[in-house]
Design a protein with these regions (language model features):
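Two-component/phosphorelay signaling modules centered on CheY-like receiver
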Residues: 13-32
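C-terminal catalytic subdomain
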Residues: 234, 254, 306-318, 323-383
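… and, occasionally, acidic/histidine-rich disordered N-termini of signaling adaptors
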Residues: 131-315, 367-383
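Acidic catalytic/metal-coordinating carboxylates
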Residues: 14, 35-39, 57, 62-68, ...
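A Lys-centered signature of the CheY-like receiver
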Residues: 104-106
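Acidic, metal-coordinating helix/loop segments flanking the phosphotransfer/catalytic sites
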Residues: 33-51
Length: 383
């Protein structure tokens, strides 16, 4: 058991030597000694210990004082077994409240020492194993997040046809998110724009996000015409997502196909937030869409699109509900009212400035509160 590092803290040299002998008899040879709490904290700062056997009554700094200091940084604190007389039960209870794993009477009974120290070391081993698995999982999820973010476009200067400017951002609530956006140059001189939101969270939603993005890109190439109908594109994607959808995973989407030269295009909304029109007037939601189900919810559904015209200087703001439903610590929503108030002063700004203002406004509102939904914004403006 030489790999187990122990620290014995007691102001009595007799107790220290007796406990060290008891530990050696049980195979624990890597034992460091400390006379009081101050020395103990210095030893703990200098190296890693698997367990600390800590006396309660000591000069300089007693056992309770040591535990209070260790509690300030519990992630690096070793397990502690308190050494105490049975008459000090109230202090023992206080030590347990401060994080001590167990206590040991000063008789240092060998069977009891073996049982309690063994139990504490086993719990530490299991915790260390769980921590390592969590670390590996977090590293894998971070790699998945990086891979996922690499799927969506970022170089909008090469995507946007002449006369159009595009910007977008996506912030997963977890390492892997279910939102997506797409900005795709079409062979006929137009552009495809899409924001979508997968039901569910985490890795399953991330996999569906990648599948949906692939289906939309493939459908955009399959649908005939220089400006493929967004309804036909979403119908193709729906056929893929609705088939054998045992997990009941759905994807809301808003998809626009726009001719850069004329500003004429079409839009199809499948259970998603309608885009905002940005111009000199107050921001307003595009209207006139038929209510249509999310992708994956209704196999064979005949999606319909509506005509859309974007005049010079006008812009479109597409977003996921992670923006309007962002929550602060009081669980209040950011809401459409705040969104519209935020958009009003930047309605004529560049798409990049609108995206930046949106993310800044949401971040200010939530003020560090953890979010449960992804946040995605895409803005296009006709020059």
């Amino acid at each position: 058991m030489s790999e187990v590092a122990l620290l014995v803290v007691d102001d009595s040299s007799f107790n220290r030597l007796m406990l060290k002998r008891r530990l050696a008899e049980q195979g624990y040879n890597d034992v460091t000694m400390a006379n009081d709490g101050v020395q103990a904290l210095a030893a703990i700062a200098a190296r890693r210990f698997d367990c600390v056997l800590l006396d309660l009554e000591m000069p300089e700094l007693d056992g309770i004082g040591v535990l209070e200091r260790l509690r300030e940084d519990p992630t690096h604190a070793p397990p502690v077994i308190v050494i105490s007389a049975l008459t000090e039960m109230q202090k023992i209870v206080r030590c347990i409240e401060l994080g001590a794993e167990d206590y040991l009477p000063k008789s240092f009974d060998p069977p009891l020492l073996r049982a309690r120290l063994g139990a504490v070391l086993e719990k530490k081993r299991l915790r260390d194993l769980a921590d390592e698995r969590l670390r590996l999982l977090e590293a894998e999820l971070e790699s998945a997040r990086t891979a996922q973010l690499s799927l969506v476009p970022r170089d909008f200067a090469t995507i946007a046809p002449p006369g159009l400017t595009i910007a977008a951002a996506m912030i997963p609530a977890r390492q892997v998110g279910g939102d997506l956006y797409e900005a795709m140059r079409l062979p006929g001189g137009g552009v495809l724009l899409c924001v979508a939101d997968v039901s569910g969270k985490g890795a399953p939603a991330g996999l569906t996000m990648a599948r949906t993005l692939g289906a939309i890109r493939a459908a955009a190439r399959l649908v005939p015409g220089p400006l493929p109908d967004p309804a036909a594109i979403l119908a193709h994607a729906n056929a893929d997502l609705a088939a054998d959808n045992e997990s009941q995973t759905f994807v809301t989407a808003a998809l626009i196909v726009l001719d850069a030269a004329t500003g004429e295009g079409r839009i199809c909304v499948a259970g998603h937030e309608a885009p905002y029109l940005l111009d000199a007037e107050p921001p307003r939601v595009l209207a006139g869409f038929a209510r249509q189900p999310p992708l994956g919810a209704w196999e064979g559904f005949a999606y319909a699109s509506c005509a859309l015209t974007l005049a010079p200087g006008q812009g479109l703001f597409l977003y996921s509900d992670g923006v309007s439903e962002a929550e602060d610590s009081a669980q209040s929503f950011f809401g459409r009212g705040r969104l519209e108030a935020m958009l009003a002063p930047v309605a004529l700004a560049s798409p990049a400035a609108v995206v930046e203002a949106t993310l800044a406004a949401v971040a200010t509102f939530v003020d560090g509160a953890a979010q449960t939904d992804d946040i995605t914004v895409l803005v296009i403006r006709r020059g």
